[in-house]
């Protein structure tokens, strides 16, 4: 594909001023101002010409243009009405030949139940404050998603990709593992954002499982156990799961029946352990 003119620092600030947008912490808005980083994300994500990609929080269009440059059809989900209205105009001005490959959905990503096309890949600079809920929601609601790369706060990304026994392994790690295999895919300098955030960022990639561990009911039961196990992570499972089963003795019996030692803690269990417990 031919290279497009991507957005730089001056263009980002000019666009924001033009439509009266001041980035807000409430919406987790930090706009990418570096074209090299945009192209790196697209490359790491393995975006191919002709495929449908969903982008959450396109903002002023930095990553959107990079995805279009790679030849993708882009479904961009934007909660801010001003940004949603402006994005097609920006693309029409900077990449008129690609404008027909962009569809903008003005919506909160957490409210999305279906999309205009069937995206196979997720590529996004996710708002820091809702990155995990958005990821889990889309993976639940958009079964066509098979892979993706997202940019998130470094601490959050490491938690998502963590395995059992890690200090940062927690509920997001287990829930993400329900849907696929996760990996960290490189750090990102905070200097490529406007405004510059107070935290570092990281790229996290995933490949979806060919089949999930169970149906929706089993997923809900598994996630409820995961939440209880990590609510007070220093407690043994016999204690932390007592509210779910009624008392510690009942929790201990359920754990033993599932082949899990009651004195273990949530951080020591794999997804398979939680699923086995939930299935009983």
UniProtKB/Swiss-Prot annotation:
* A molecular function (GO) term: RNA binding
Q: Does the keyword Transferase apply?
A: yes
Alphabetically ordered keywords of this record: Cytoplasm, Methyltransferase, RNA-binding, rRNA processing, S-adenosyl-L-methionine, Transferase
Give binding positions for S-adenosyl-L-methionine.
30, 32, 57, 78, 108, 125
**What residue stretch is flagged as signal peptide?**
none
From what superkingdom does this record's organism come?
A: Bacteria
Which reaction does this enzyme catalyse, per its entry?
Answer: adenosine(1518)/adenosine(1519) in 16S rRNA + 4 S-adenosyl-L-methionine = N(6)-dimethyladenosine(1518)/N(6)-dimethyladenosine(1519) in 16S rRNA + 4 S-adenosyl-L-homocysteine + 4 H(+)
Q: Which InterPro entries match?
A: KsgA/Erm, rRNA_Ade_diMease-like_C, rRNA_Ade_Mease_Trfase_CS, rRNA_Ade_methylase_Trfase_N, rRNA_adenine_dimethylase, SAM-dependent_MTases_sf
GO CC annotations on file: cytosol
Which enzyme class? transferase
User: What the protein does?
Assistant: Specifically dimethylates two adjacent adenosines (A1518 and A1519) in the loop of a conserved hairpin near the 3'-end of 16S rRNA in the 30S particle. May play a critical role in biogenesis of 30S subunits.
* Matches recorded under NCBIfam families: ksgA
Indicate what this protein is called per its UniProt record.
Ribosomal RNA small subunit methyltransferase A
The organism named in the record is: Leifsonia xyli subsp. xyli (strain CTCB07)
Query: According to the entry, what is the taxonomic lineage of the organism?
Result: Bacteria, Bacillati, Actinomycetota, Actinomycetes, Micrococcales
